[in-house]
Amino acid sequence: MATNLRGVMAALLTPFDQQQALDKASLRRLVQFNIQQGIDGLYVGGSTGEAFVQSLSEREQVLEIVAEETKGKIKLIAHVGCVSTAESQQLAASAKRYGFDAVSAVTPFYYPFSFEEHCDHYRAIIDSADGLPMVVYNIPALSGVKLTLDQINTLVTLPGVGALKQTSGDLYQMEQIRREHPDLVLYNGYDEIFASGLLAGADGGIGSTYNIMGWRYQGIVKALKEGDIQTAQKLQTECNKVIDLLIKTGVFRGLKTVLHYMDVVSVPLCRKPFGPVDEKYLPELKALAQQLMQERG
């Protein structure tokens, strides 16, 4: 059902203008930039996309624009997760209407929901997605929901679930999931362990830094398929040097600043309460943008 979703999927950023409104022109440029750099698909409206500081209407607009801009050229996964099941269902129905290939939802957070309530939440979204496969999104560090291996096994075997986005540094658990579910599409979620995640059993990844250097991650996939561990390690090291800087600057605003210097995003701002990049990092981010543009050619 979801085997065609394997690959390198950029977790799409959402550009805003100086007034904090959705910047549709920059969003369209960013989609095209990702297509041109050779990624396999886009994961739209997730953590990287600042979904939880947007209205439901804005999230639907983003889905519609991305679908219009891609025109079936790449795979599209719509993150529709909200704390509210009803709102998640509304977004899932919109994703189906706009022609997305799959939906995804983070575990409902903030309130201490029972595991059965989590399962019911996913069942309802799957029903509203009307046949689109579900990508369960496990990100305990941000959601605060720490699923056990048995609970993950239960979620990924719900009817309609086709994939898991495993944003966790627990590579042992990644391997356990792969061993238990050989046909499950399994995404590595932390960019800094992409190569390790693939070796632990992931089919590909969904990541924020793919927006600026997706070709490097494709290079890691290619190297590992060819048994070239040395090249994969070298590429991962180069990716991690970038990630080291982005962690200092704030990842999303740092990425937007790099894309601003690449003439992709007009305004390098995230939505408040996120603040701007500290000016002391701007020279490093500008140099990084120039380096990546030269490398990409």
Curated annotation (Swiss-Prot):
Belongs to the DapA family. NanA subfamily. It catalyses: aceneuramate = aldehydo-N-acetyl-D-mannosamine + pyruvate. CDD domains: NAL. One of its GO terms (cellular component) is cytosol. This is N-acetylneuraminate lyase. It is an enzyme of class 4 (lyase). InterPro entries: Aldolase_TIM, DapA-like, NanA, Schiff_base-form_aldolases_AS, Schiff_base-form_aldolases_CS. It is found in: Cytoplasm. The gene is nanA. Homotetramer. Catalyzes the reversible aldol cleavage of N-acetylneuraminic acid (sialic acid; Neu5Ac) to form pyruvate and N-acetylmannosamine (ManNAc) via a Schiff base intermediate. Aceneuramate binds at residues 47-48, 167, 189, 191-192, 208. Its EC number is 4.1.3.3. Keywords: Carbohydrate metabolism, Cytoplasm, Lyase, Schiff base. It comes from the Bacteria. Pfam families: DHDPS. Its main location: cytoplasm. The keyword Lyase applies. GO terms for molecular function: N-acetylneuraminate lyase activity. Pathway: Amino-sugar metabolism; N-acetylneuraminate degradation; D-fructose 6-phosphate from N-acetylneuraminate: step 1/5. HAMAP family: N_acetylneuram_lyase.
